[in-house]
């Protein structure tokens, strides 16, 4: 991108974002990232137990999808440099264990957490510094984690994901999954 920004009039922004979550996520235990898999584990839990791999200490920065879309809209409208790299995230790391506990609490389910210590615990903590996005574009994440979790749980329930046994609802037209780009649903 940087090379092409030097030889032509097109401007490029490389967005380095944290873990994105929200409605229309992939809620699949085998194929999704930590948020989607955790929601699926909690909502599909049997016997009143949710199992966490390792000790649950790994920590991730989670960013609600609408906040990322808002940044993309701002970058498209306000970018002045030919090329730039911008970090976009919540700026806060949450442990897998704390995420599991919050999803359980907000789901209203009565579940107990167990640990599978045969699985790895990788000492990892990531919190994205979004100060450049804030300074250059006036951007800050707007969605609190608990609010984003509630919106995601509602979408999951409304979409009937667990009952249908798939990651996302299919569009009624041509059997496609709805595409969402820059806040506009295209079906």
Q: Where are the language model's segments positioned?
A:
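Flexible, glycine-rich beta-alpha linker
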Residues: 13-35, 58-59
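Active-site Tyr-X1-5-Lys
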Residues: 1-18, 34-47
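C-terminal substrate-binding subdomain of Rossmann-fold SDR/epimerase-dehydratase oxidoreductases
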Residues: 38, 44-184
């Amino acid at each position: 991108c940087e090379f092409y920004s030097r030889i032509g009039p097109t401007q490029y922004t490389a967005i380095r974002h944290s873990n994105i979550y929200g409605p229309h996520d992939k809620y699949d235990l085998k194929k999704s990232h930590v948020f989607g898999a955790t929601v699926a584990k909690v909502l599909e839990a049997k016997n009143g137990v949710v199992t966490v791999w390792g000790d649950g200490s790994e920590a991730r920065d989670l960013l609600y999808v609408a906040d990322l879309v808002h940044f993309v809209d701002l970058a498209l409208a306000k970018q002045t440099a030919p090329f730039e790299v911008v970090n976009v995230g919540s700026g806060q790391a949450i442990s897998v264990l704390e995420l599991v506990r919050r999803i359980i609490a907000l789901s209203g389910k009565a579940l107990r957490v167990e640990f599978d210590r045969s699985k790895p615990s990788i000492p990892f903590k990531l919190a994205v510094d979004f100060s450049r996005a804030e300074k250059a574009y006036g951007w800050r994440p707007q969605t609190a984690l608990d609010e984003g979790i509630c919106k995601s749980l509602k979408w999951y329930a409304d979409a009937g994901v667990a009952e249908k046994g798939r990651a996302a609802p299919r569009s009624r037209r041509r059997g496609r999954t709805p595409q969402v780009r820059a806040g506009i649903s295209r079906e």
